[in-house]
Amino acid sequence: MVPRCQIDVLYFAKSAEIAGVRSETISVPQEIKASELWKELEMLHPGLADVRNQVIFAVRQEYVELGDQQLLLQPGDEVAIIPPISGG
């Protein structure tokens, strides 16, 4: 069985509106795919399914696509849900 850890999730823009919070602490497996982490968040906030294709994670300030990338999380890690970024 994979050990679990507490991580801090930060929500921005539409994801914060849907979740109704700007941040929260949740317990997740330490070893988890990015897509599985997203599913855990959708279970907490089902409306997040609406923005799944519009966001990426930032894990310890590194961008991570919501795919099959394996994450090795540590207690207290910060995972941000980043909305689309436009630049010019």
Curated annotation (Swiss-Prot):
Acts as a sulfur carrier required for molybdopterin biosynthesis. Component of the molybdopterin synthase complex that catalyzes the conversion of precursor Z into molybdopterin by mediating the incorporation of 2 sulfur atoms into precursor Z to generate a dithiolene group. In the complex, serves as sulfur donor by being thiocarboxylated (-COSH) at its C-terminus by MOCS3. After interaction with MOCS2B, the sulfur is then transferred to precursor Z to form molybdopterin. It comes from Mus musculus (Mouse). The modification 1-thioglycine is found at G88. Pathway: Cofactor biosynthesis; molybdopterin biosynthesis. Heterotetramer; composed of 2 small (MOCS2A) and 2 large (MOCS2B) subunits. PANTHER family: MOLYBDOPTERIN SYNTHASE SULFUR CARRIER SUBUNIT. InterPro entries: Beta-grasp_dom_sf (IPR012675), MOCS2A (IPR044672), MOCS2A_euk (IPR028887), Mopterin_synth/thiamin_S_b (IPR016155), ThiS/MoaD-like (IPR003749). This is Molybdopterin synthase sulfur carrier subunit. It is found in: Cytoplasm, Cytosol. C-terminal thiocarboxylation occurs in 2 steps, it is first acyl-adenylated (-COAMP) via the hesA/moeB/thiF part of MOCS3, then thiocarboxylated (-COSH) via the rhodanese domain of MOCS3. The lineage of its organism: Eukaryota, Metazoa, Chordata, Craniata, Vertebrata.
